[in-house]
Amino acid sequence: SLLAVSMIFTMMSTTVVHAQSVKDGSNEVTVTPNVGVSYVSPEETIETRGTSRPSKVWNIKSKGQYDFAGSSHYQNLYTNYKFTGKTSYKVYVENTGDNPITVTAKRLTKTYGSTKISAGKTGSFEFSNIKSDTEFYIVFEGNGYSFSGHVK
Protein backbone atom coordinates (compact mmCIF):
# COMPACT_ATOMS: atom_id res chain seq x y z
CA SER A 1 0.00 0.00 0.00
CA LEU A 2 0.99 3.64 -0.33
CA LEU A 3 1.38 3.99 3.43
CA ALA A 4 3.82 1.05 3.60
CA VAL A 5 5.87 2.45 0.70
CA SER A 6 6.07 5.90 2.28
CA MET A 7 7.09 4.35 5.62
CA ILE A 8 9.88 2.40 3.91
CA PHE A 9 11.16 5.58 2.24
CA THR A 10 10.99 7.42 5.56
CA MET A 11 12.95 4.68 7.33
CA MET A 12 15.48 4.51 4.49
CA SER A 13 16.00 8.27 4.48
CA THR A 14 16.96 8.24 8.15
CA THR A 15 19.78 5.77 7.51
CA VAL A 16 21.56 7.94 4.94
CA VAL A 17 24.80 9.28 6.36
CA HIS A 18 26.69 12.14 4.77
CA ALA A 19 30.36 12.18 5.63
CA GLN A 20 32.86 14.84 4.72
CA SER A 21 36.52 14.23 5.31
CA VAL A 22 39.36 16.70 5.32
CA LYS A 23 42.28 15.11 3.48
CA ASP A 24 44.95 17.68 4.21
CA GLY A 25 45.56 16.41 7.74
CA SER A 26 44.11 19.50 9.40
CA ASN A 27 42.02 19.33 12.53
CA GLU A 28 38.31 18.67 12.33
CA VAL A 29 35.98 21.60 11.83
CA THR A 30 34.12 22.98 14.81
CA VAL A 31 30.51 22.74 13.67
CA THR A 32 28.75 26.03 14.28
CA PRO A 33 25.09 26.34 13.23
CA ASN A 34 24.78 28.72 10.29
CA VAL A 35 22.98 31.83 11.53
CA GLY A 36 22.41 34.63 9.05
CA VAL A 37 24.72 33.05 6.45
CA SER A 38 24.38 30.49 3.66
CA TYR A 39 26.27 29.01 0.71
CA VAL A 40 24.34 31.20 -1.76
CA SER A 41 25.75 34.59 -2.73
CA PRO A 42 23.20 37.42 -2.70
CA GLU A 43 24.55 38.32 -6.15
CA GLU A 44 23.82 34.84 -7.56
CA THR A 45 20.35 34.35 -6.14
CA ILE A 46 17.59 34.34 -8.74
CA GLU A 47 13.92 34.75 -7.91
CA THR A 48 11.69 31.95 -9.16
CA ARG A 49 9.16 34.54 -10.34
CA GLY A 50 10.07 37.79 -12.01
CA THR A 51 13.23 38.97 -13.70
CA SER A 52 14.85 41.08 -10.98
CA ARG A 53 17.35 40.03 -8.35
CA PRO A 54 15.93 39.63 -4.86
CA SER A 55 15.72 42.76 -2.77
CA LYS A 56 16.53 41.10 0.57
CA VAL A 57 18.16 44.07 2.24
CA TRP A 58 18.99 44.74 5.90
CA ASN A 59 19.04 48.47 6.63
CA ILE A 60 21.55 48.74 9.47
CA LYS A 61 20.55 52.32 10.28
CA SER A 62 16.93 51.36 10.98
CA LYS A 63 17.24 47.67 12.02
CA GLY A 64 20.57 47.84 13.83
CA GLN A 65 23.45 45.40 14.04
CA TYR A 66 23.25 42.16 12.00
CA ASP A 67 24.63 39.08 13.79
CA PHE A 68 25.99 36.01 12.01
CA ALA A 69 27.76 32.72 12.73
CA GLY A 70 28.63 29.66 10.69
CA SER A 71 31.00 26.91 9.68
CA SER A 72 32.03 25.25 6.44
CA HIS A 73 34.51 22.61 5.34
CA TYR A 74 35.59 24.31 2.13
CA GLN A 75 32.75 26.32 0.59
CA ASN A 76 32.39 30.08 0.88
CA LEU A 77 29.59 31.38 3.09
CA TYR A 78 27.67 34.60 2.41
CA THR A 79 25.42 36.78 4.54
CA ASN A 80 21.73 36.18 3.83
CA TYR A 81 21.19 39.90 3.32
CA LYS A 82 22.75 42.78 1.49
CA PHE A 83 23.37 45.72 3.83
CA THR A 84 22.56 49.39 3.41
CA GLY A 85 21.63 52.51 5.41
CA LYS A 86 24.93 54.04 6.50
CA THR A 87 28.04 55.67 5.02
CA SER A 88 30.45 53.76 7.28
CA TYR A 89 30.37 50.22 8.66
CA LYS A 90 32.35 48.00 11.02
CA VAL A 91 32.63 44.24 10.52
CA TYR A 92 33.72 42.23 13.58
CA VAL A 93 34.48 38.49 13.37
CA GLU A 94 35.72 35.92 15.88
CA ASN A 95 37.42 32.95 14.22
CA THR A 96 36.23 30.03 16.37
CA GLY A 97 37.96 27.38 14.26
CA ASP A 98 41.41 25.88 13.74
CA ASN A 99 42.16 27.44 10.34
CA PRO A 100 42.46 31.01 9.04
CA ILE A 101 39.52 32.72 7.33
CA THR A 102 39.24 35.70 5.02
CA VAL A 103 36.27 38.03 5.54
CA THR A 104 35.37 40.47 2.76
CA ALA A 105 32.68 43.17 2.46
CA LYS A 106 31.82 43.62 -1.20
CA ARG A 107 29.34 43.90 -4.00
CA LEU A 108 29.65 42.22 -7.37
CA THR A 109 32.14 44.69 -8.85
CA LYS A 110 33.79 46.29 -5.81
CA THR A 111 35.48 45.28 -2.56
CA TYR A 112 35.03 47.70 0.37
CA GLY A 113 37.13 45.98 3.02
CA SER A 114 38.73 42.66 3.88
CA THR A 115 40.78 40.97 6.58
CA LYS A 116 42.40 37.58 7.16
CA ILE A 117 41.87 36.24 10.68
CA SER A 118 44.11 33.55 12.19
CA ALA A 119 42.68 30.52 13.99
CA GLY A 120 41.21 31.38 17.38
CA LYS A 121 41.67 35.14 16.90
CA THR A 122 39.29 38.04 16.39
CA GLY A 123 39.49 40.60 13.66
CA SER A 124 37.61 43.60 12.36
CA PHE A 125 37.69 46.23 9.67
CA GLU A 126 35.87 49.47 9.00
CA PHE A 127 35.10 51.21 5.75
CA SER A 128 33.43 54.47 4.82
CA ASN A 129 33.95 54.64 1.05
CA ILE A 130 30.26 53.89 0.41
CA LYS A 131 26.95 55.72 -0.10
CA SER A 132 24.11 55.02 2.32
CA ASP A 133 21.93 53.51 -0.43
CA THR A 134 24.68 51.25 -1.85
CA GLU A 135 24.14 47.56 -1.06
CA PHE A 136 26.97 45.22 -0.06
CA TYR A 137 27.28 41.75 1.44
CA ILE A 138 29.94 39.80 3.36
CA VAL A 139 31.69 36.64 2.16
CA PHE A 140 33.63 34.21 4.37
CA GLU A 141 36.37 32.10 2.75
CA GLY A 142 38.61 29.33 4.04
CA ASN A 143 39.08 25.59 4.53
CA GLY A 144 37.52 23.97 7.56
CA TYR A 145 36.50 27.16 9.32
CA SER A 146 33.96 28.46 11.82
CA PHE A 147 33.16 31.96 13.03
CA SER A 148 30.72 34.33 14.68
CA GLY A 149 30.37 38.07 14.54
CA HIS A 150 28.37 41.06 13.35
CA VAL A 151 28.23 44.07 11.07
CA LYS A 152 27.12 47.47 12.33
Residue ranges and their predicted role:
Residues 1-69:
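N-terminal prepro-regions of secreted/extracellular proteins
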